[in-house]
Amino acid sequence: KAPEFQGEVVLVTGAASGIGKACVESFLARGCAVIGIDLDNSITSTSSGSNYLGLVCDITNENKFKEVLETGVRYFGGIDMVVLNAGIFPGGKKVSELPTDEWRKVFSVNLDANLVLLREIYPLLQLAPNKGRAVIIGSKNVSAPGPGAAAYSASKAALNQLMRVLAMEWGSDGIRLNTLHPNAVFDTAIWTDEVLTSRAKHYGLSVNEYKTNNVLGVEVSSKDVAELAAEMCGSLFAKTTAAQVPVDGGNDRVI
């Protein structure tokens, strides 16, 4: 039996580390060709083999993104799927102390760049033989925001609304868009040992207790999120669009 995504191409943003890198691995394992883009130069060596192309790109630079998109399409011949994972989470500042420039920077990465990406990739998804698919990496903060995360929470909520609108606008093309809402994925760049220790102490927990502080008592990894992202592009979810699926072990505020 041929791999599920053999002959198909996925574009993954923020693909040099964390959830994005795990997505590269999950899609490659299913026979997919992968275009990985990231601001980090290590993206060019995130994976090896003829089915992977890593390209350095600041997704907030519209012209650079268009150039990179064209490079990827010329290399593999098209794009069937996209995983929107790139995002930033500065955090820590209450709204009363939040600089306008920081607010705008978070929105430029988490929302505006994704609008451009989706708009530019739309004609390619329309041509996908098995219909185009998009998975948006959202956040628990969409339904359960936290103090000190105004820009992040608001930008992810706006991105989620964009997904819902596009699910309606692109449904007639057979294009499916769905969002995954992870929480506390600790093997990503933002969770340094220092941050982990600090947050655990804030809640009066050990680091291990903090990592599994959810209804199921499990730790959620980048691979967990990536595997579901890949599955949502597959036949199992062929009749699902505009869904929002938590990947958080069960967060009591979300539930």
Predicted regions, residues:
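Residue(s) in the substrate-gating loop at a strand-loop-helix junction
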Residues: 139
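Conserved glycine-rich cofactor-binding loop
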Residues: 16-17
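Alpha-helical segment proximal to the catalytic Tyr-Lys
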Residues: 123, 168-169, 238
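Active-site helix of classical SDR
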Residues: 118, 155, 163
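C-terminal substrate-recognition "lid" of short-chain dehydrogenase/reductases
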Residues: 218-247, 252-253
